[in-house]
């Protein structure tokens, strides 16, 4: 349970590195901590840790979607929340997949894993997220 709460917290830190907050060290801290958690867990557990990380990341990072649906789309409060949560949950599947693939493909060479494999997996999944099913490039 503690691991999942830390993963959620790490996800909440990530968007704080971007506008309007611009506290860029939080992004580095977020990624460092989530990599630590992924290493600590099993391959199956890595997906869940990544998914929960995504819930925090997307929950804070795209909170404007709720505003658009509720206020500009004139949808009810509960319906807007449910739709936004489903959207965030689906986007979090990509961060779960990133964590799973990293854990699955990880070697014993830490330099190769952290400097090459993780960034390549992260960017590849980001490209997939940007185009698959019409994409969401945010």
Residue positions per predicted region:
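Membrane-embedded alpha-helical bundles of multi-pass enzymes
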Residues: 1-138
